Design a protein with these regions (language model features):
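A structural detector for beta-sheet-dominated domains
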Residues: 20, 30, 40-44, 54, ...
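Short hydrophobic membrane-inserting alpha-helices and related fusion/pore-forming segments
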Residues: 147-172
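N-terminal propeptides/leader regions of secreted preproproteins
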Residues: 2-124
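Short, aromatic- and cysteine-enriched interfacial helices/patches
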Residues: 66, 158-162, 186
Length: 267
């Protein structure tokens, strides 16, 4: 068998994300129509395993095996993340802003219409709710890459666009070698995640009754052993993007239907 070094390759095609790819083993992930997370592992182009994590019970992983059976002699089984480590999950908010709502500022726009220009803007405020930390101690894990991905996803209930690059960084940072899709050297580590949830309120400066709530999240993930520790990941709308053209476009598209417009300034 050929040993392959872990890769940090992370790409997306349509709604399926490639989480891990070492040239022989490929792990992909996506969210199905019911909100479940689904992870698949391919070996030399052939599907060998599919794991499903229910949005209602993320600590249980349903596994299906293709072309062979697992070490338990079954084509299907379930595992619990607590079989592989110790989970300490806090649902208490560590911190909220001193004021119940933070004013980020106002984005001022100008659109071209038949009669000339129209000026308008968005007043943008947000709440920040910090939850955690959640910690998961992995005890001597040996097994497939897709199971490791699923275990971490289930432990932290973080979205696939976040768990993908983190697991790739963890595998690379720990210097793990994968042989035919299997991590054979026992992996032990403690991973910690602090989640910050943002709820934005966008209010039309020309009509206060025209408003909308949108969300985003920040995940600070670290561990005790990896060279890739202390990573921050963002999803959705976060203050990290405030002042960027991208955020001005995102928020405008959430609220307005003008096709020819520009940002005048931020205030």
């Amino acid at each position: 068998m050929t040993a392959h070094a872990a890769s940090t390759n992370y790409s997306s095609e349509e709604n399926v994300l490639t989480i891990y790819d070492d040239g022989e083993t490929v792990v992909k992930g996506y969210e199905d129509s019911t909100g479940n997370m689904v992870f698949t592992q391919y070996l030399r182009g052939n599907l060998v395993q599919r794991n499903t994590i229910s949005s209602n019970n993320p600590e249980i992983i349903r596994r299906e095996f293709f072309g062979n059976t697992n070490t338990r002699g079954a084509s299907k089984d379930t595992i619990n993340i607590n079989e592989y480590g110790v989970l300490n999950k806090s649902t208490a908010a560590l911190h909220q802003s001193v004021s119940p709502r933070t004013l980020a500022g106002t984005i001022n726009y100008r659109a071209i219409i038949d009669t000339g220009y129209v000026y308008y803007g968005l007043r943008c405020t947000y709440d920040a709710n910090v939850i955690g930390p959640t910690t998961y101690t992995i005890n001597g894990y040996v097994g497939t890459v897709v199971d490791l991905v699923s275990i971490i996803a289930g432990a932290f209930t973080i979205p696939i666009p976040i768990v993908g690059p983190y697991v790739a960084a963890l595998i690379s940072g720990l210097g793990i070698t994968v042989v035919s899709g299997v991590i054979e050297s026992a992996l032990s580590d403690t991973v910690s995640c602090i989640e910050t949830d943002y709820t934005w309120t966008l209010t039309d400066t020309t009509d206060s009754y025209h408003s909308k709530n949108v969300t985003g999240a920040k995940y600070y993930i670290t561990d005790t052993k990896s060279a890739a520790k202390d990573k921050t990941y963002y999803e959705g709308y976060t203050p990290n993007d405030w002042g960027t053209q991208a955020m001005a476009v995102w928020f405008h598209n959430e609220m307005f239907g003008y096709t020819a417009w520009e940002v005048v300034n931020w205030s």
